[in-house]
């Protein structure tokens, strides 16, 4: 029994989001299993996998030899191995790169499209889920397992949950919440990730940025104490030699269209506009506002104005504060 994604509607900002059940069709799951899974993953990603507890999840980066990210991964322990969530558009490429050296290790790396990914967010999301699961994750235990279901907790931009489960449980949850929750497609979760400052890597931006250019270090996703991993030299150089000049910015305002991942935007300089940055993700909300996540120089003045490329009207975008410090977590 396949689970059918919900029809899309315009996403809402977290501050006024009603209880919403979200199908996460633009995200995908993958796993690594086998006796060598921890050791192998330790040599592939930026975080110290050995320190990842059963009750935790973490946003980490998987880089090439030059330190450019194939993708970022929402990583957690799963069974006798690990699982991670990433954007569906990058999963095949990311898995192919991670498998390159797997022949020498006792591991199996595979996509998992049998699992269903759902988000629960908005007004009284915790209370709604408490009726269906015995234990819910929280700030102290952001990952819990309830039977066939893994639940992940997120505190930003407001409390929300990711539900990783089978099609039967997903359908049951959908049926039970149908009367009290609105349904929406994955653009709503994307809007919340933009507000949260969680970097979103889609295919056009794969293999383009070092992790620090997307604030992974501020989210606790880089260990500078662990042993060798793919891209470590360049990631370390960015920290210790100040080689990274970019960071992730959260912009909000209005635009005549929604910019696509990989596009640049325009920055106001006096009477003129100059192209800058790279869009990671953008959405238009139900109130007409445009939210965008853009990698730009990390020394920008907070009052700088921006606009969508080739914007003809008076629409502009401004910098919004991120809900976390850019210091290393």
UniProtKB/Swiss-Prot annotation:
tRNA processing is among the record's keywords: yes
Gene3D superfamilies, A to Z: 2.40.30.160, 3.30.70.1630, Aminomethyltransferase beta-barrel domains (3.30.70.1400)
Q: Which domain of life is it from?
A: Bacteria
The protein's location, in the record's own words, is: Cytoplasm
Q: What does the entry list as the binding residues for folate?
A: 27, 189
Task: Tell me which Pfam families the record gives.
Answer: GCV_T, YgfZ_barrel
Q: What does this protein do?
A: Folate-binding protein involved in regulating the level of ATP-DnaA and in the modification of some tRNAs. It is probably a key factor in regulatory networks that act via tRNA modification, such as initiation of chromosomal replication.
Q: What is this protein called?
A: tRNA-modifying protein YgfZ
Q: Which organism is it from?
A: Cronobacter sakazakii (strain ATCC BAA-894)
